[in-house]
Protein backbone atom coordinates (compact mmCIF):
# COMPACT_ATOMS: atom_id res chain seq x y z
CA UNK A 1 0.00 0.00 0.00
CA UNK A 2 3.01 2.31 0.26
CA UNK A 3 6.19 1.06 -1.43
CA UNK A 4 4.59 -0.86 -4.29
CA UNK A 5 1.53 1.32 -4.77
CA UNK A 6 3.58 4.51 -4.98
CA UNK A 7 6.29 2.98 -7.15
CA UNK A 8 9.03 3.69 -4.62
CA UNK A 9 12.44 2.41 -5.70
CA UNK A 10 14.97 4.05 -3.33
CA UNK A 11 15.47 5.33 0.20
CA UNK A 12 14.99 9.01 -0.67
CA UNK A 13 11.61 8.32 -2.27
CA UNK A 14 10.57 6.28 0.77
CA UNK A 15 11.43 9.18 3.06
CA UNK A 16 8.93 11.33 1.15
CA UNK A 17 6.23 8.67 0.79
CA UNK A 18 2.64 9.34 1.86
CA UNK A 19 1.51 6.94 4.59
CA UNK A 20 -1.98 8.29 5.24
CA UNK A 21 -4.14 5.91 7.27
CA UNK A 22 -1.31 3.53 8.18
CA UNK A 23 -1.92 3.95 11.91
CA UNK A 24 1.75 4.24 12.94
CA UNK A 25 3.92 7.28 12.19
CA UNK A 26 7.43 6.47 10.97
CA UNK A 27 10.09 9.11 11.51
CA UNK A 28 12.88 9.66 8.96
CA UNK A 29 15.22 7.55 11.08
CA UNK A 30 12.74 4.68 11.31
CA UNK A 31 12.13 4.80 7.56
CA UNK A 32 15.88 4.60 6.97
CA UNK A 33 16.04 1.58 9.27
CA UNK A 34 13.13 -0.16 7.54
CA UNK A 35 14.14 0.49 3.93
CA UNK A 36 16.85 -2.26 3.69
CA UNK A 37 14.11 -4.84 4.31
CA UNK A 38 12.34 -3.79 1.11
CA UNK A 39 15.62 -3.77 -0.81
CA UNK A 40 16.47 -7.28 0.36
CA UNK A 41 12.96 -8.52 -0.47
CA UNK A 42 13.27 -7.27 -4.04
CA UNK A 43 16.76 -8.73 -4.31
CA UNK A 44 15.48 -12.13 -3.21
CA UNK A 45 12.66 -11.97 -5.76
CA UNK A 46 15.04 -10.92 -8.53
CA UNK A 47 17.39 -13.83 -7.77
CA UNK A 48 14.44 -16.12 -8.47
CA UNK A 49 13.48 -14.18 -11.61
CA UNK A 50 10.33 -12.93 -9.92
CA UNK A 51 8.73 -9.52 -9.43
CA UNK A 52 5.81 -8.07 -7.57
CA UNK A 53 3.03 -7.24 -10.03
CA UNK A 54 3.20 -3.52 -9.21
CA UNK A 55 6.96 -3.49 -9.85
CA UNK A 56 6.36 -5.19 -13.21
CA UNK A 57 3.84 -2.47 -14.10
CA UNK A 58 6.36 0.20 -13.10
CA UNK A 59 9.12 -1.39 -15.18
CA UNK A 60 6.78 -1.59 -18.18
CA UNK A 61 6.05 2.14 -17.86
CA UNK A 62 9.79 2.86 -17.79
CA UNK A 63 10.32 0.84 -20.97
CA UNK A 64 7.51 2.65 -22.78
CA UNK A 65 8.76 6.10 -21.78
CA UNK A 66 12.55 5.69 -21.87
CA UNK A 67 12.65 3.64 -25.07
CA UNK A 68 10.10 5.86 -26.77
CA UNK A 69 7.98 2.91 -27.84
CA UNK A 70 5.13 4.14 -30.03
CA UNK A 71 1.71 3.14 -28.75
CA UNK A 72 -0.41 0.85 -30.88
CA UNK A 73 -3.59 2.14 -29.27
CA UNK A 74 -5.56 5.30 -29.98
CA UNK A 75 -7.89 4.80 -27.01
CA UNK A 76 -8.33 2.55 -23.98
CA UNK A 77 -11.63 1.79 -22.21
CA UNK A 78 -11.35 0.58 -18.61
CA UNK A 79 -14.09 -1.03 -16.50
CA UNK A 80 -13.98 -1.83 -12.75
CA UNK A 81 -11.45 0.98 -12.27
CA UNK A 82 -11.92 0.87 -8.50
CA UNK A 83 -10.03 -2.44 -8.36
CA UNK A 84 -6.94 -1.18 -10.18
CA UNK A 85 -3.92 0.03 -8.21
CA UNK A 86 -1.87 3.17 -8.95
CA UNK A 87 0.81 1.36 -10.96
CA UNK A 88 -1.76 -0.33 -13.20
CA UNK A 89 -3.39 3.02 -13.97
CA UNK A 90 0.01 4.62 -14.67
CA UNK A 91 0.71 1.83 -17.14
CA UNK A 92 -2.59 2.43 -18.91
CA UNK A 93 -1.74 6.13 -19.09
CA UNK A 94 1.61 5.29 -20.69
CA UNK A 95 0.06 2.89 -23.20
CA UNK A 96 -1.83 5.56 -25.12
CA UNK A 97 -0.73 9.02 -26.24
CA UNK A 98 -2.46 11.97 -24.57
CA UNK A 99 -5.24 13.37 -26.70
CA UNK A 100 -8.98 13.72 -27.10
CA UNK A 101 -10.92 10.68 -25.86
CA UNK A 102 -7.71 8.77 -25.13
CA UNK A 103 -8.81 7.15 -21.87
CA UNK A 104 -12.28 6.26 -20.60
CA UNK A 105 -12.65 4.95 -17.04
CA UNK A 106 -15.73 3.45 -15.39
CA UNK A 107 -15.74 2.57 -11.70
CA UNK A 108 -17.74 2.42 -8.48
CA UNK A 109 -16.14 3.03 -5.09
CA UNK A 110 -18.99 1.12 -3.41
CA UNK A 111 -17.63 -2.03 -5.05
CA UNK A 112 -13.96 -1.54 -4.14
CA UNK A 113 -13.28 -4.94 -2.58
CA UNK A 114 -9.48 -4.68 -2.78
CA UNK A 115 -8.67 -1.76 -0.46
CA UNK A 116 -4.93 -2.27 -0.89
CA UNK A 117 -5.30 -1.23 -4.55
CA UNK A 118 -6.95 2.12 -3.86
CA UNK A 119 -5.80 4.74 -6.34
CA UNK A 120 -6.59 8.36 -7.18
CA UNK A 121 -6.65 8.97 -10.93
CA UNK A 122 -5.14 12.46 -10.71
CA UNK A 123 -2.14 11.07 -8.79
CA UNK A 124 -1.55 8.59 -11.61
CA UNK A 125 -1.24 11.10 -14.43
CA UNK A 126 -4.92 11.02 -15.42
CA UNK A 127 -6.49 14.48 -15.28
CA UNK A 128 -10.28 14.24 -14.93
CA UNK A 129 -10.98 17.75 -13.66
CA UNK A 130 -14.16 18.94 -15.34
CA UNK A 131 -14.33 15.73 -17.36
CA UNK A 132 -15.93 13.29 -14.91
CA UNK A 133 -19.60 12.40 -14.50
CA UNK A 134 -21.43 10.58 -11.74
CA UNK A 135 -24.21 8.21 -12.77
CA UNK A 136 -26.90 8.15 -10.08
CA UNK A 137 -29.59 5.94 -11.64
CA UNK A 138 -29.44 2.20 -10.97
CA UNK A 139 -31.09 0.31 -13.82
CA UNK A 140 -30.47 -3.22 -12.47
CA UNK A 141 -31.32 -3.41 -8.79
CA UNK A 142 -34.67 -2.61 -7.20
CA UNK A 143 -34.86 0.30 -4.79
CA UNK A 144 -35.54 -2.10 -1.92
CA UNK A 145 -32.39 -4.12 -2.60
CA UNK A 146 -30.32 -0.98 -3.10
CA UNK A 147 -31.35 0.48 0.28
CA UNK A 148 -30.62 -2.69 2.26
CA UNK A 149 -27.30 -3.20 0.48
CA UNK A 150 -26.29 0.40 1.18
CA UNK A 151 -27.07 -0.10 4.87
CA UNK A 152 -24.19 -2.58 5.06
CA UNK A 153 -21.85 0.20 3.92
CA UNK A 154 -22.77 2.54 6.77
CA UNK A 155 -19.51 3.84 8.24
CA UNK A 156 -17.45 2.67 5.27
CA UNK A 157 -15.32 5.15 3.37
CA UNK A 158 -16.60 5.41 -0.21
CA UNK A 159 -14.29 7.33 -2.53
CA UNK A 160 -14.90 8.88 -5.94
CA UNK A 161 -11.73 7.34 -7.49
CA UNK A 162 -9.92 10.67 -7.25
CA UNK A 163 -9.18 11.44 -3.58
CA UNK A 164 -12.74 12.65 -2.93
CA UNK A 165 -15.71 11.11 -1.13
CA UNK A 166 -18.78 9.76 -2.86
CA UNK A 167 -22.28 10.56 -1.64
CA UNK A 168 -24.62 7.59 -1.56
CA UNK A 169 -27.79 9.58 -0.85
CA UNK A 170 -28.26 10.77 -4.42
CA UNK A 171 -28.47 7.32 -5.96
CA UNK A 172 -31.84 5.81 -6.87
CA UNK A 173 -33.30 2.77 -8.61
CA UNK A 174 -36.06 2.84 -11.20
CA UNK A 175 -37.61 -0.55 -10.35
CA UNK A 176 -39.39 -1.78 -7.21
CA UNK A 177 -39.65 -5.21 -5.65
CA UNK A 178 -39.85 -7.17 -2.39
CA UNK A 179 -37.81 -6.03 0.61
CA UNK A 180 -34.81 -8.38 1.10
CA UNK A 181 -35.27 -10.96 3.85
CA UNK A 182 -32.38 -11.69 6.24
CA UNK A 183 -32.10 -14.76 8.49
CA UNK A 184 -29.33 -15.65 10.94
CA UNK A 185 -28.57 -19.18 12.18
CA UNK A 186 -26.18 -20.68 14.69
CA UNK A 187 -25.14 -23.67 12.62
CA UNK A 188 -24.87 -24.88 9.03
CA UNK A 189 -27.63 -27.46 9.37
CA UNK A 190 -30.27 -24.82 10.13
CA UNK A 191 -28.87 -22.51 7.45
CA UNK A 192 -29.01 -25.38 4.94
CA UNK A 193 -32.68 -26.06 5.70
CA UNK A 194 -33.50 -22.39 5.19
CA UNK A 195 -31.53 -22.28 1.94
CA UNK A 196 -33.32 -25.33 0.54
CA UNK A 197 -36.69 -23.86 1.49
CA UNK A 198 -35.89 -20.56 -0.18
CA UNK A 199 -34.63 -22.30 -3.32
CA UNK A 200 -37.91 -24.20 -3.47
CA UNK A 201 -39.90 -20.95 -3.08
CA UNK A 202 -37.91 -19.16 -5.77
CA UNK A 203 -38.34 -21.92 -8.34
CA UNK A 204 -42.12 -22.27 -8.13
CA UNK A 205 -44.70 -20.59 -10.35
CA UNK A 206 -43.64 -17.48 -12.23
CA UNK A 207 -40.38 -17.32 -10.27
CA UNK A 208 -39.38 -20.62 -11.90
CA UNK A 209 -38.71 -18.73 -15.11
CA UNK A 210 -36.12 -16.51 -13.43
CA UNK A 211 -32.40 -17.12 -12.98
CA UNK A 212 -31.16 -17.85 -9.46
CA UNK A 213 -27.71 -17.74 -7.87
CA UNK A 214 -26.43 -18.55 -4.39
CA UNK A 215 -23.48 -16.26 -3.63
CA UNK A 216 -21.30 -17.41 -0.74
CA UNK A 217 -18.56 -15.69 1.27
CA UNK A 218 -16.08 -18.55 0.68
CA UNK A 219 -15.46 -21.49 -1.63
CA UNK A 220 -16.05 -23.90 1.25
CA UNK A 221 -19.46 -22.39 1.98
CA UNK A 222 -20.29 -22.29 -1.73
CA UNK A 223 -19.43 -25.97 -2.20
CA UNK A 224 -21.36 -26.97 0.92
CA UNK A 225 -24.46 -25.08 -0.24
CA UNK A 226 -24.25 -26.54 -3.73
CA UNK A 227 -24.08 -30.09 -2.38
CA UNK A 228 -27.10 -29.54 -0.11
CA UNK A 229 -29.22 -28.11 -2.93
CA UNK A 230 -28.05 -30.77 -5.39
CA UNK A 231 -29.23 -33.48 -3.00
CA UNK A 232 -32.72 -31.98 -3.21
CA UNK A 233 -32.81 -32.80 -6.91
CA UNK A 234 -32.05 -29.37 -8.36
CA UNK A 235 -29.79 -28.91 -11.35
CA UNK A 236 -26.75 -26.96 -10.11
CA UNK A 237 -23.64 -25.35 -11.53
CA UNK A 238 -20.63 -23.62 -9.97
CA UNK A 239 -19.51 -20.38 -11.59
CA UNK A 240 -15.73 -20.74 -11.65
CA UNK A 241 -13.30 -17.84 -11.84
CA UNK A 242 -11.92 -18.84 -15.22
CA UNK A 243 -15.18 -19.43 -17.07
CA UNK A 244 -18.05 -17.40 -18.48
CA UNK A 245 -21.57 -17.89 -17.16
CA UNK A 246 -24.38 -18.68 -19.61
CA UNK A 247 -27.44 -18.30 -17.39
CA UNK A 248 -30.37 -20.72 -17.71
CA UNK A 249 -33.54 -20.55 -15.55
CA UNK A 250 -33.58 -24.33 -14.89
CA UNK A 251 -30.19 -24.22 -13.13
CA UNK A 252 -29.25 -22.97 -9.66
CA UNK A 253 -25.87 -21.26 -9.85
CA UNK A 254 -23.30 -21.03 -7.06
CA UNK A 255 -20.57 -18.42 -6.83
CA UNK A 256 -18.21 -16.79 -4.39
CA UNK A 257 -18.66 -13.09 -3.68
CA UNK A 258 -15.43 -12.20 -5.47
CA UNK A 259 -16.41 -14.16 -8.59
CA UNK A 260 -19.91 -12.66 -8.63
CA UNK A 261 -18.60 -9.23 -9.60
CA UNK A 262 -19.85 -8.35 -13.06
CA UNK A 263 -22.61 -10.97 -13.01
CA UNK A 264 -26.34 -10.50 -12.60
CA UNK A 265 -29.28 -12.79 -11.90
CA UNK A 266 -33.00 -12.31 -11.35
CA UNK A 267 -32.83 -13.78 -7.85
CA UNK A 268 -29.91 -13.99 -5.43
CA UNK A 269 -29.45 -15.71 -2.10
CA UNK A 270 -26.41 -14.47 -0.20
CA UNK A 271 -24.86 -17.03 2.16
CA UNK A 272 -22.30 -15.50 4.48
CA UNK A 273 -20.41 -16.13 7.68
CA UNK A 274 -21.31 -13.57 10.34
CA UNK A 275 -17.62 -12.73 10.73
CA UNK A 276 -17.77 -10.85 7.44
CA UNK A 277 -19.65 -8.03 9.17
CA UNK A 278 -17.13 -7.95 12.01
CA UNK A 279 -14.13 -7.50 9.73
CA UNK A 280 -12.12 -4.45 10.79
CA UNK A 281 -11.66 -3.40 7.17
CA UNK A 282 -14.46 -2.28 4.86
CA UNK A 283 -13.83 -5.17 2.49
CA UNK A 284 -16.33 -7.57 4.06
CA UNK A 285 -19.19 -5.10 3.98
CA UNK A 286 -18.43 -4.14 0.40
CA UNK A 287 -18.46 -7.82 -0.55
CA UNK A 288 -21.97 -8.09 0.91
CA UNK A 289 -22.98 -5.01 -1.05
CA UNK A 290 -21.62 -6.50 -4.27
CA UNK A 291 -23.32 -9.85 -3.65
CA UNK A 292 -26.75 -8.37 -2.89
CA UNK A 293 -26.72 -6.04 -5.87
CA UNK A 294 -26.18 -8.89 -8.35
CA UNK A 295 -29.97 -9.38 -8.15
CA UNK A 296 -32.42 -7.74 -10.54
CA UNK A 297 -35.66 -8.76 -8.84
CA UNK A 298 -35.14 -10.25 -5.39
CA UNK A 299 -32.32 -10.72 -2.89
CA UNK A 300 -32.26 -12.71 0.35
CA UNK A 301 -29.49 -13.11 2.94
CA UNK A 302 -28.50 -15.96 5.26
CA UNK A 303 -25.89 -15.42 7.99
CA UNK A 304 -24.39 -18.40 9.77
Where are these regions (language model features)?
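Short acidic/histidine-centered micro-motifs embedded in hydrophobic/aromatic stretches
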Residues: 2, 59, 109
Amino acid sequence: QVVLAQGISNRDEYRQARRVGRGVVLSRGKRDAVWPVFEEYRTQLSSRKLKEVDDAYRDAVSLLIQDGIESQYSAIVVDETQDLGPQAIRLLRAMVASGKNDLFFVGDGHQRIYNRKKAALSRCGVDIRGRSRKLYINYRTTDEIRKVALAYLEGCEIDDLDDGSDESKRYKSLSRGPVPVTSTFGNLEEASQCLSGWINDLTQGEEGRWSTCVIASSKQLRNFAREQVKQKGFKTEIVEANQSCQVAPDTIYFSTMHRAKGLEFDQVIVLSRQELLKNESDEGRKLLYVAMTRARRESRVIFV
